[in-house]
A protein has these predicted regions:
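Long, basic/Gly/Ser/Thr-rich N-terminal segments
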Residues: 1-113
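N-terminal pre-Walker A segment at the start of P-loop NTPase domains
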Residues: 119-146
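Short hydrophobic/aromatic beta-strand immediately N-terminal to the Walker A/P-loop
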Residues: 152-154
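P-loop (Walker A) phosphate-binding loop of NTP-binding proteins
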Residues: 158
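Conserved lysine of the Walker
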Residues: 163
Length: 186
C-alpha cells in the first residue's frame, strides 16, 4: 500500500461517493486513531473514527486526489518486496511462494484475506498525509454544510504559506469558486 497507494482504482474503476458513505454507516465506532501512517507520505484514514466529522464526499475527494498524485512504480514495489523477503517472519519457502504468486499476477493489487477481514474488520481509505493538517478546517466546513449553512471562507497568510494550495484543494472538494485577491491590485 505504501508504494502503490490506492492502485486498485485503475483496475476496479472509481467507486462513487455513495460507496464510502455507506461504508461509513456500516463501520463500527471503534477507538482507533483517526489516521495511521503507512510510510511514503500515505496514511490510512480510519472510517471507524471519522463518524460525523467529515462527509463521505470529502473523504472520497481526498482519496481520489491521492490516487491521482501518488504513482508508485513497479521498481519501487520490487525494492520493498525484497526488503520484506529479507526480513520476513515466514519461512523462506512461504515467502518465495507468495512472491511468485504476486509476480504471476503481474503484481496485481492484493486484497485483505478473509481471516484478516474477520479479525480486524478494516474500514479505511488511503490518503496523502499532507491532507491531515487541513482536517480541522475541513471538519468545520463539513459541519456547516451538513447543517445546511452557506459558507464563505477567506484565506490569509504570508507569501508562499500554502494559500493557493489550500484554495485549490477546497475548490476541488466543494466545487466552489476561488477569487484570488492578488488579481485586484488593492
Amino acid at each position: 500500500q505504501a508504494v502503490l497507494g490506492p492502485a486498485h482504482l485503475g483496475r476496479m474503476g472509481t467507486p462513487p461517493p455513495d460507496y464510502i458513505i455507506n461504508e461509513m454507516k456500516k463501520a463500527p465506532k471503534r477507538n482507533l486513531p483517526l489516521t495511521e501512517s503507512i510510510g511514503n507520505g500515505l496514511c490510512r484514514l480510519n472510517l471507524d473514527s471519522i463518524h460525523n466529522h467529515l462527509r463521505g464526499e470529502t473523504i472520497h475527494t481526498l482519496f481520489l486526489a491521492t490516487a491521482e498524485e501518488h504513482q508508485g512504480t513497479l521498481d519501487e514495489l520490487k525494492e520493498q518486496l525484497t526488503l520484506w523477503k529479507n526480513n520476513s517472519i515466514f519461512s523462506e519457502e512461504e515467502t518465495t511462494a507468495e512472491l511468485l504468486k504476486l509476480e504471476e499476477s503481474n503484481y496485481a493489487p492484493v486484497s485483505h484475506s478473509q481471516p484478516y477481514h474477520s479479525a480486524y474488520d478494516p474500514h479505511y481509505r488511503l490518503i496523502s498525509e499532507r491532507f491531515i493538517k487541513y482536517f480541522p478546517l475541513l471538519e468545520r466546513i463539513d459541519q456547516r454544510l451538513m447543517h445546511g449553512e452557506k459558507t464563505l471562507l477567506a484565506i490569509d497568510g504570508r507569501c508562499a504559506s500554502g494559500k493557493t494550495t489550500l484554495a485549490a484543494l477546497l475548490s476541488r472538494i466543494y466545487a466552489c469558486s476561488v477569487i484570488h485577491i492578488d488579481d485586484f491590485f488593492l
